[in-house]
Amino acid sequence: MATMQISAKGLAPLRPRVSSRRVVKPVASGGGKTDITKVGLNSIEDPVVKQNLMGKSRFMNKKDWKDASGRKGKGYGVYRYEDKYGANVDGYSPIYTPDLWTESGDSYTLGTKGLIAWAGLVLVLLAVGVNLIISTSQLGA
């Protein structure tokens, strides 16, 4: 059993805490400028939707634009470093990329592996349910 030394006031003396965890510091790799034309949004015809998905605005790059509350913009655009790095996170990793979909992008088919996975999931859930019913009732006694 470990013993603790008691100081004059009845509390254990303070010692520096030693941690065995490593501190990991992320370092940016400087990947260069993102090419906005290769992210899968070229087939979108509506320019407003296309700019929204790319994280751009045709108005915010101008000095005289005003936001919804009436404050004057600074002319940096949506992403201040767009000219330097190419795109914001919306540009290099957009949520909706129809160019990268399959030929039948409007429909989703599971295929054989998907059906087997769903059947396995249903069987596992049924087995768990039957086990719970039997273990909590008089049927298991």
From Swiss-Prot:
Keyword presence, Signal: no
InterPro entries according to UniProt: PSII_PsbR
Keywords per UniProt: Chloroplast, Membrane, Phosphoprotein, Photosynthesis, Photosystem II, Plastid, Thylakoid, Transit peptide, Transmembrane, Transmembrane helix
Residues with Phosphoserine modification: 43
Principal cellular location given in the protein's record: plastid
Span of the transit peptide along the chain: 1-27
Superkingdom as given in the UniProt entry: Eukaryota
Pfam families named in the record: PsbR (PF04725)
GO cellular component: chloroplast thylakoid membrane; photosystem II oxygen evolving complex
Membrane topology, record value: Single-pass membrane protein
Post-translational modification Phosphothreonine, affected residues: 34, 37
Membrane spanning residue stretches: 114-134
Subcellular location: Plastid, Chloroplast thylakoid membrane
Any single biological process term in GO: photosynthesis
Entries under PANTHER family matching the protein: PHOTOSYSTEM II 10 KDA POLYPEPTIDE, CHLOROPLASTIC
Function, as annotated: Associated with the oxygen-evolving complex of photosystem II (PSII). Is required for the stable binding of LHCSR3 to PSII-LHCII supercomplexes and is essential for efficient energy-dependent quenching and the integrity of the PSII-LHCII-LHCSR3 supercomplex under continuous high light.
Family statement: Belongs to the psbR family.
Protein name: Photosystem II protein PSBR, chloroplastic
